[in-house]
A protein has these predicted regions:
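Extracellular carbohydrate recognition and processing domains
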Residues: 59-63, 67-91, 98-103
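Extracellular polysaccharide-targeting segments
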Residues: 1-23, 32-36, 96-136
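Extra-cytoplasmic beta-strand recognition segments
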Residues: 13, 32-66, 83-87, 108
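Low-complexity, intrinsically disordered short peptide segments enriched in small/polar/basic residues
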Residues: 1-4, 14, 42-45, 70-71
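Short secondary-structure junctions
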Residues: 22-26, 71-73
Length: 136
């Protein structure tokens, strides 16, 4: 048996993500809510390697305004947005047309493409621990 690895250092999103043109406020549950103070704003996700899958689980009333900068989106659900990082620039949760729009980041995953495929095979779009056993 091998392991599925979440490569992101803060999978439960308990530390603030680098806001650009947004304010961050810590909630009672330890998560952060970000509110844009410009029309376009972003949460820059550091440590993403080209070719990896980044998955962001977030809550917002304006899901239509969000995308993943520097990524080819490969998955969308009512809570999760995932994409393959294919750039050398920013990897961010990007909000367009969102002055005053808020988002709470609940979890972040960073996976190899093979591990992401295995998660999908298990019927999962998410896993926020460090390691998870997987069938070979």
């Amino acid at each position: 048996m091998s392991l599925i690895t979440n490569l992101y250092g803060d999978p439960k999103a308990l530390r603030p993500i680098g806001p650009w043109c947004a304010d961050a406020a810590k909630n009672n549950d330890g998560k952060y809510t970000y509110t844009g103070n410009r029309t376009n704003w972003a949460l820059v996700i550091n440590g993403v390697t080209r070719g990896c899958v980044v998955a962001v689980d977030f809550s917002t009333s304006r899901r239509d305004a969000f995308g993943l900068e520097g990524c080819q989106v490969i998955y969308k659900s009512s809570t999760t947005l995932a994409g393959v990082y294919k750039s050398t620039g920013n990897c961010s949760l990007y909000c367009s047309g969102g002055e005053g729009v808020s988002a709470t980041v609940n979890r972040i995953g960073l996976y190899s493409q093979d591990d992401w495929k295995r998660l999908q095979q298990y019927g999962l779009d998410w896993f926020d621990g460090d390691l998870m056993p997987r069938q070979n």
